[in-house]
Amino acid sequence: MRLVHFRNYTDERVSFDDGIQLICGSNAQGKTNLLEALYFCSTVRSHRTAQDRDLIQNEESSFLIDLSLYRRGRSEQLRVCVNERGKNLFLHGNPVRRVSDFIGEVNAVLFCPDDMNLFTSSPRIRRRFIDIELSKLSRRYTQTLGLFQKLLKERNALLKQNALDEVYLRVLSEQMADCEIIIMKQRQTFLQELFALCRPFYRSLAQDDTEIGFTYHTCLDSDHLDDREMLLQKYEKGRQRDLLSGQTNIGVHKDDVTFTVDGQNVNSFASQGQKR
């Protein structure tokens, strides 16, 4: 990996071998920055800041990350260039037009102290966790979520207008419902598969019969996640509230997840060790 003007790195090359890598160094020398660069190549975002310009070295106008991988018997090249105008992504020297086509090329999983906030923070943090992981696994999910967010922004803007276009509101609601069915089903499946993998590992670590689980809270019951008409009825039922508030109050942008240990909410009953 090569880092140019990324955080405190002016122009640095780093090589990794197979197996476990242990990164050692004094404080403020760039250990976390190195991991941040790897994670940026996976998700095209930082886990520490929402502003890409914060990643650019002081007094510079851009940064570059070059990553060379060897997998599946062949060499692969990834490049990320970020400047004040935005991101430029490349695979094997070819420009990538859509971020969704780049995310997941490097499938990295990050665990850091801030992850403890997953249980105590707002539902937005839990949705973000699911969205990031699913985006690395499914381009369809990434594209559908992006389209939904665009439609949601348009619907909210429409709700704030004095003269409401009823036909356009209906069209937006229908298009959003189509997206939401895909999003809800993929979120539900992801959580089911995640916990199926986690349960035996958790029991092994805890060395007891503690049962971990989750409840996915969304706008439809788990048995009706593909019921488009039911979702549209909810939009219609919430129409007056949406008009009064000037925003859409029903949808997957309000989803949440409750994590449990032996049926009890992790946030209220789990120890710090259990949360980790």
Residue ranges and their predicted role:
Residues 1-26, 167-276:
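Conserved NTPase motor "head" modules and their coupling/switch loops across ABC/AAA+ ATPases, GTPases
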Residues 5, 34, 55, 65, ...:
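Conserved RecA-like P-loop NTPase ATPase core
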Residues 17-54, 271-276:
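Phosphate-binding glycine-rich loops of NTP-binding sites
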Residues 42-125, 131-141, 195-199, 227, ...:
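Nucleotide-state sensing region of NTPase/ATPase domains
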Residues 55-58, 148, 187:
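Intracellular alpha-helical coupling/juxtamembrane segments of multi-pass membrane proteins
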Residues 129-132, 154, 175-182:
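A general alpha-helix detector
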